[in-house]
Amino acid sequence: MNPNQKIITIGSVSLTIATICFLMQIAILVTTVTLHFKQYECSSPPNNQVMPCEPIIIERNITEIVYLTNTTIDKEICPKLVEYRNWSKPQCKITGFAPFSKDNSIRLSAGGGIWVTREPYVSCDPGKCYQFALGQGTTLDNKHSNDTIHDRTPYRTLLMNELGVPFHLGTRQVCIAWSSSSCHDGKAWLHVCVTGYDKNATASFIYDGRLVDSIGSWSKNILRTQESECVCINGTCTVVMTDGSASERADTKILFIEEGKIVHISPLSGSAQHVEECSCYPRYPGVRCVCRDNWKGSNRPVVDINVKDYSIVSSYVCSGLVGDTPRKNDRSSSSYCRNPNNEKGNHGVKGWAFDDGNDVWMGRTISEESRSGYETFKVIGGWSTPNSKLQINRQVIVDSDNRSGYSGIFSVEGKSCINRCFYVELIRGREQETRVWWTSNSIVVFCGTSGTYGTGSWPDGADINLMPI
């Protein structure tokens, strides 16, 4: 090949390569511009938050002798949509309850640095569960813990930790409160916090860390709320509040709250005579609560809340095996669904139950007179048949030789169904244990299971003789 032919050949090859490079550059430019201007927005229904999600484009140009360009494009992945919870899945079918969590707060307090608390409860956001309690403004190994048997002081605050984490000195104090309720609507936490004088208390409504609304005492007699989780459906949260006598007629109202703002208040209606300390759960499309009648009944009141039209219906759990303490023995006790049974109705304890078709699952103290022991069981026909007493699937949670206390329900949404869980307050100290001057608690938590399970007892477990006085 002569020199002229070599020059022509090299020129032809170079021109071909240059043309290919030019076409590749145009293709890369078109791709880059298309990706840059393409809209990436995580759209959602009108009630949901709109979260823009623009792609991040990073170009790395690596130049070779042949002028080829490699471009790497990294695209941001849109975050999950933040939506209101609607709790529309069915309730899980269960055979009983399995152990879930225990915080051992009193045993750990022997080493110091753990809050004095009472009125604990559990509630979950879409990803994690938390335990709450009303602190007494002191740790147990502190002389301020003396006389903490009292319910209402200006030093009490609502504490919040991940479930299973005892309330140590680094615990967040959510608000000032001697009565409270909390729930997550899918976007943020709502806390209802009651504090102030008995005759003129204030309930503060804190949403997403900000005070949004408040309401003052309407009957001037210890405004109080659930001491367990409230429930939110499609952005509307419901909380049951009572103001008035603890042993006669009181004034109960159901508040409807949207992002911390009170949007409606409904009076209690129906046949329930006295309603306090409700344990509520989502029963789509509404909310259902099982409460404490501190006046006339040892059978528990039921409050059904319609979130759409704000209507309220109330009655009583039909099961003749009643859930409150004190109560008559099971042979003598009764309940006929509509009215209080007038059996040892004065006084009581916070508790829970939930419907399962025509049946009812429930928990109660083993003792008929005191807050000792704890058991759960199912009553066939207990939700629909007056005075039904056929008990199955009984479990002992705390044996009768150990103390219990308040108990309540919380709900956890799974992939295909909504599970019901409960906690039991394990009270220690005064009045029963007079060696010490404080009153506090730990908790144990169980959740519904469709599997098999064994037996046991899960008391507080602290040796009172090893505890600070």
UniProtKB/Swiss-Prot annotation:
Name of the protein: Neuraminidase
Membrane topology: Single-pass type II membrane protein
Cellular component GO terms held in the UniProt record: host cell plasma membrane; membrane; virion membrane
Domain comment (free text): Intact N-terminus is essential for virion morphogenesis. Possesses two apical sorting signals, one in the ectodomain, which is likely to be a glycan, and the other in the transmembrane domain. The transmembrane domain also plays a role in lipid raft association.
Positions with a binding annotation for substrate: 118, 152, 276-277, 292, 371
Principal location listed in the UniProt entry: virion
Species the sequence originates in: Influenza A virus (strain A/Bangkok/1/1979 H3N2)
Annotated glycosylation sites: 61, 70, 86, 146, 200, 234, 402
Modifications made to the protein after synthesis: N-glycosylated.
Chain ranges on the Virion surface side, renumbered to this chain: 31-469
Subunit and partners: Homotetramer.
Entries under Pfam families matching the protein: Neur (PF00064)
Keyword hit for Transmembrane helix: yes
